[in-house]
Amino acid sequence: MNWKDKVKTTFYSCDRFVRFVIQHFIQDDCTYIASALAFTSLLAVVPLMSVGLAIFSSFPVFQGLAEPVQNFIFDNFVPATGKIVQSYLQQFTSQVSKLSIWGIVFLIFTALLVMFTIERAMNKIWRVSSSRHGVSAFLLYWAIISLAPVLLGLSLAASSYLFSMPILADHRAPYTILHYSPFFLSLIGFTFLYVVVPNCPVKIRHAFWGGLVAAILFESAKHAFAYYLIRYNTYALLYGAFATVPIFFIWVYWVWIITLLGAEISYAFSVHHQRRGGKSLDGFSHALLWLHQLWLAQQHGKGLSFNDLVDASKQPFAVDVDEMINALIYHELIHATADGHYMLSRDLSHVTLYDLTQLLPYRLPTHLELQYSKASLAEQWRAAFKRHNEELKKSLDINLEELFKKTGTVIK
């Protein structure tokens, strides 16, 4: 393959990948989900700050760092209106100490609720039918809420210590690192979100690429939003002093748009069959292949993740993987477990190939399709499909004119 062909192939693959991301972004109603998450985030921002600061202040090593952490967050992650929003939120959080025990419980519940909403959105993108429940969900959400301020505090404490060292005091490198630290923190945060929150295994490299795109878009949006507010602040003219609220809501909305787009990119990298070349594996063989893989896993008492199923074939799939998953679940052939894996729902000793042809909306592969699926199909399957095609050919070996003559009258 010469360089021109390589360029064409790369361009075609990128075009398919981008189309896939856009299609799924629209299909998953990400704009609607982003608006719901933005509203939930506004309700939960005070509880989240209160819980985070309470955890942060409980560590003696972080005494005196609470205000620098807040300043760092609002200076680097909230454009233009950050200082005003910060002053309002500090007034709200200062009232938390006056709450009763039930008020504090409600605050914690609201903080956990936003995590549940985020997980549900991520599960929809990764096509996971079940969310975490009970203790496992609580522990994960609480770990994220409690670890985030601690890790941020550790990073700031480490930075302060390093910059105070005489050997680094006169060098420009530490300040260059500090300048780019918001970008790297965004990258780490997005990657962590895409790996941990979905209720299914997500490879770190796939989450990283989605996180990288999201971090770049986030930094770009931050500067663009700040520029717009400085040059064309329509909301300030309309709402006056009250303009901070709609501006902050719009900014949170766009943050969630970027976050969900990064999640769609991570998911697209996971479903790498969309970028494979070659002839597609037909729908019936695809279903049979996945049932076979699940049957093999069940012999060892295990289920398979979404990525495991996608990796079962080196060929691209003719039927979209989401459609196939939904078809197998709908016909009660497989089900999703609590940890996001898939397992068989039926005893396959009582399911015949004929049953499968009647259940699934996919026909048996033709002779031509069998030639292109040598890498994915066992010889026993190929022999059964070949016999079916030969018998079908004998049964339907009648020309249409003869068939119509036998019909006799015109069908009304």
From Swiss-Prot:
Keyword Membrane: yes
Spans through the membrane: 36-56, 99-119, 137-157, 177-197, 210-230, 241-261
GO cellular component, one term: plasma membrane
Pfam families xref list: Virul_fac_BrkB (PF03631)
Top-level lineage group: Bacteria
Keywords: Cell inner membrane, Cell membrane, Membrane, Transmembrane, Transmembrane helix
Membrane topology label: Multi-pass membrane protein
Family matches, as InterPro entries: UPF0761_bac, Virul_fac_BrkB
Cleavable signal peptide: none
Localization of this protein: Cell inner membrane
Main location: membrane
PANTHER family: INNER MEMBRANE PROTEIN YHJD, UPF0761 MEMBRANE PROTEIN YIHY
Family: Belongs to the UPF0761 family.
Protein name per Swiss-Prot or TrEMBL: UPF0761 membrane protein lpg0643
Source organism (scientific name): Legionella pneumophila subsp. pneumophila (strain Philadelphia 1 / ATCC 33152 / DSM 7513)
